[in-house]
């Protein structure tokens, strides 16, 4: 029985030792974030609640610039109800596929990792809802399809409970 428990524990620990992003290491085309987020981009997206119901749609015009390992991505959102929002990301290429991101509504620092054609971000966003601000965790996955197109799917949660998903389609102009 002790051997069975030890084997089960070892199997569980080894399954936890590799990052989920590593499964994409061989996927092509390889994502060069500084190249993709350089220049003008356009995106279309939506938010769905945890039941899958469509809550909000939006369009985003973006401009990215890089100087060495430092980048800036200016995002201008227009939501389906006519409201507008701007977010400015300050990005840092830390090397070895690691990125950091900061924005005014991001609590702390977003941590990103690239493997193959996939980027996974983890961050907490201060999200205003009906006059209150909630800190919501994002598990954000970006999938490069070709040098002009990317699909982004982010899961939002609070206290470990899924709130919904954001889906975006990016196109370089």
Provide a role label for each language-model segment.
Residues 12-15:
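C-terminal motif of bacterial Sec signal peptides marking the signal peptidase cleavage site
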Residues 17-19:
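Bacterial signal peptide processing site
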Residues 22, 60, 66, 140, ...:
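Sequence-level preference for short, compositionally simple segments enriched
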Residues 24-40:
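N-terminal helix-cap/turn-to-beta initiation motif at the start of protein domains
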Residues 37-46, 152:
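A short, Trp-centered hydrophobic/proline-enriched beta-strand micro-motif
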Residues 44, 48-129:
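Central antiparallel beta-sheet cores of small beta-barrel/beta-sandwich binding domains
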Residues 139-173:
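Glycine-rich, aromatic-bearing surface loops/beta-hairpins
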């Amino acid at each position: 029985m002790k051997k069975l428990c030890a084997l089960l524990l070892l199997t569980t620990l080894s399954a936890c030792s590799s990052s989920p992003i590593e499964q994409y290491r061989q996927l092509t085309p390889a994502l060069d974030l500084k190249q993709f987020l350089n220049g003008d981009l356009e995106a279309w997206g939506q938010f769905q609640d945890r039941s899958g119901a469509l809550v909000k749609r939006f369009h985003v015009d973006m401009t990215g610039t890089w100087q060495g390992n430092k980048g800036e991505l200016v995002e201008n959102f227009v939501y389906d109800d006519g409201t507008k929002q701007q977010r400015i990301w300050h990005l840092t290429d830390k090397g070895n596929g690691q990125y950091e991101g900061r924005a005014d509504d991001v609590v702390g620092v977003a941590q990103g990792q690239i493997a193959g054609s996939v980027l996974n971000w983890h961050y907490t966003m201060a999200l205003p809802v009906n006059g209150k601000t909630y800190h919501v965790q994002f598990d954000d996955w970006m999938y490069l399809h070709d040098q002009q197109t990317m699909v982004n799917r982010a899961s939002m949660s609070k206290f470990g409970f899924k709130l919904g998903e954001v889906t975006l389609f990016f196109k370089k102009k």
